[in-house]
Amino acid sequence: MPESILSVQNLVKRYGDATVVSDLSFAIAPGECLGVIGPNGAGKTTTIRMCLGLTVPDEGTVTAFGLHMPKDALAIKAQLGVVSQMDTLDPDFSCAENLLVYGRYFGMKDAQIRERIPALLEFASLTAKANAKPGELSGGMKRRLSLARALVNNPRLLLLDEPTTGLDPQARHLMWERLQLLLAEGKSILLTTHFMDEAERLCHRLLVVDHGKKIAEGAPRDLIRQYLEPDVVEVYGSGALALADSPLKAMAARLEVSGETVFFYTADAKPLLQALAAYPQLRTLHRPANLEDLFLKLTGRQIREDA
């Protein structure tokens, strides 16, 4: 395996009596996208902040490009690109000016930045908006501008904290296309997300965290095979909940109830589907197990207080 571009070892962060990150370790190889998924309050954003040197860990180490955070913070940040959850674009500057001003923070000369701006705007599909201010942009345009800004210094590693939250499906797909282009160029990405389709589409590996602890790690399809039965049958409609205590329960390896829906997890859905034909008033959906099933199995279906 290639040498890690980012290595996190035994990170711990406490706030008072609460441990929000507990003995967390992971690494990212060059050209790899590592996704971090978990419920609200699982410690994802705190982990990103420690990787950026914005939050000091109580225990553990962060090493990037062979350098140590926070001792070598400036040298590390010169090779990082960051897209945070919140919009941090300057509302008083145009798109092009946002890129120019941001590049100056890295000590880049104006001429060097101006040379990069046209390609960055083209990458973000914002060439026609070069002179527009952020307030004139859609949500998707703002996120793409934030991504373009994160690329001003030509970073080796991108840290993206829920980069597509709040975007409509079309804007999310366009953002995914841009991120896939960056991966094809050999850049590395550390990504937090609540979208399981995003995680499956972009990430080579996933880190599942809950209550600040790593509870699973691996390639998306490998994790699904490891933790889940291959077939899922969702049943809903009048009388569906009664099936949870019916003889059909024996036809599934595992059964879950959420709201008005019963989820049957099985290695072979055919006998179950045949039995369900006796309940024409019910609606059924037969599908393969996916990352959302994995997420819910490992972290639970209960909504967290800060969700």
List the predicted regions and their residue ranges.
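Catalytic Walker B motif of ABC-type/P-loop ATPase nucleotide-binding domains
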Residues: 158-161
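Conserved catalytic motifs of ABC-family nucleotide-binding domains
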Residues: 154
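ABC transporter nucleotide-binding domain
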Residues: 176-267
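Conserved ABC ATPase signature
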Residues: 133-137
